[in-house]
């Protein structure tokens, strides 16, 4: 004990402890309802936040004397929204292919001083999974955001996606994980398959390598980072699953497959989750409308839902679109998980984001009512315990 006291005194004298570390910033939020997403709803609850983390949550919580109290009667607290699949705020020219570019990092495109980020904060999004861009995959159209390019699609290994907060004075302040996942653009032809398997096999023989073109694939092969795959048709999905059978530790996430409901048995068997747009689809070659998120959820495929359009308007309209999916049959609790904890799990960051639990980042929304009621408004947005948006 004496040695510990001497060590602490030495740290204070030599600057080993910062002022921030010595004095915790403590906040206590009192609200009518706290929807944790993973542990139910707490009525008349309290959340205690210290240094950006949730320290306590419940009904009968002792509030520290030093805490700043935010009393929000008649309000609901909900986790910050997580969009796992976006290109918003990115405008660098796309790259060509088919090719293997695992060293390409989307963080090198980040520019934080954009009105788009401020506006999607106001829409409740506290975390984004940003995709590496490719010729034939996305192109920026002023006023509309990122849409599929009409040119020949690039395929292969697109690079490393980033996980970011949509706020910060510089790119470093935005980054949650600069190499959060590996992105593959898949097509079921021999050339694309050879590009992918050649890169993976090469990395498999260099598992201790730290080379920029190898390390991301090593981490993907080990399942230490997820692998997001853009795969458009049921047939392509079956080809993909067959191709990647030898690499069985990879954590696959399918992106954008509107017909994935046709291969649900294979997805359930492999425990592969899917990212879907918030929209009611038309069944192929018919005028029949179908709720694909509902169909996958009922088949016990884990889903995450992203905005229908990858622009500001799509993000601002997101909760209304989720409410429409629920009205059309999507289970309400699954819908809430599909916009919070499920995308966090797919990105591999559920240990710190996606729900309101002790130990996690205090990323939360203060709402006027239920998050899936059309009339609900977002009063405040917090990221790591700091208010980053307030409604006028």
Please identify what each model-predicted range represents:
Residues 7-18:
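Bacterial N-terminal signal peptides
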Residues 20-25:
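Boundary at the C-terminal end of the N-terminal hydrophobic targeting segment
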Residues 32, 47, 52, 74, ...:
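Divalent metal-coordination and catalytic microenvironments
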Residues 32-35, 43-45, 345, 357-392:
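C-terminal cap of metal-dependent C-N hydrolases
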Residues 34, 38-78:
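Histidine-rich, glycine-flanked metal-binding segment
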Residues 93-95, 100-104, 226, 268, ...:
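His/Asp/Glu-enriched, well-ordered alpha-helical/loop segment
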Residues 121-238, 242-251:
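Polyanionic/metal-chelating signatures
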């Amino acid at each position: 004990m004496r040695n510990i006291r001497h060590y602490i005194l030495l740290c204070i004298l030599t600057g080993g402890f910062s002022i921030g570390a010595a004095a915790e910033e403590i906040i206590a939020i009192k609200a009518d309802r706290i929807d944790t997403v993973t542990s139910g709803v707490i009525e008349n609850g309290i959340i205690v936040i210290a240094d950006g983390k949730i320290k306590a949550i419940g009904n009968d919580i002792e509030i520290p004397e030093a805490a700043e109290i935010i009393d929000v009667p008649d309000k609901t607290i909900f986790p910050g929204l997580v969009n796992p699949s976006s290109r918003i705020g990115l405008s660098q020219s796309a790259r060509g292919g088919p090719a293997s570019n695992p060293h390409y990092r989307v963080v090198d495109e980040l520019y934080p001083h954009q009105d788009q980020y401020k506006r999607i904060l106001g829409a409740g999004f506290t975390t984004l999974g940003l995709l590496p861009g490719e010729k034939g995959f996305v192109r920026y159209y002023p006023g509309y955001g990122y849409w599929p390019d009409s040119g020949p699609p690039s395929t292969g290994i697109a690079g490393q996606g980033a996980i970011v907060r949509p706020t910060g004075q510089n790119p470093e302040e935005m980054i949650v994980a600069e190499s959060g996942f590996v992105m593959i653009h898949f097509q079921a032809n021999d050339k694309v398959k050879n590009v992918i398997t050649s890169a993976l096999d090469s990395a498999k023989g260099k598992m201790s390598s730290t080379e920029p073109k190898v390390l991301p694939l090593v981490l993907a092969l080990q399942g230490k980072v997820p692998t997001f795959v853009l795969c458009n048709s049921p047939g392509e999905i079956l080809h993909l699953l067959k191709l990647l059978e030898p690499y069985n530790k990879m954590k696959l996430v399918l992106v954008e497959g509107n017909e994935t409901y046709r291969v649900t048995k294979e997805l359930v068997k492999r425990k592969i989750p899917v990212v879907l747009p918030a929209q009611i689809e038309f069944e192929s070659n018919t005028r029949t409308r179908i709720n694909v998120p509902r169909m996958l959820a009922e088949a016990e495929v884990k889903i995450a839902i992203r905005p229908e359009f990858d622009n500001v308007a799509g993000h601002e309209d997101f909760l209304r679109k989720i409410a429409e999916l629920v009205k059309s049959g999507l289970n309400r609790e699954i819908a809430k998980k599909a916009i919070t904890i499920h995308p966090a799990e797919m990105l591999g960051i559920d240990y710190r984001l996606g729900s309101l639990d002790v130990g996690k980042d205090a990323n939360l929304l203060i709402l006027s009512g239920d998050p899936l009621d059309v009339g609900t408004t977002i009063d405040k947005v917090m990221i790591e315990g700091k208010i980053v948006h307030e409604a006028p």
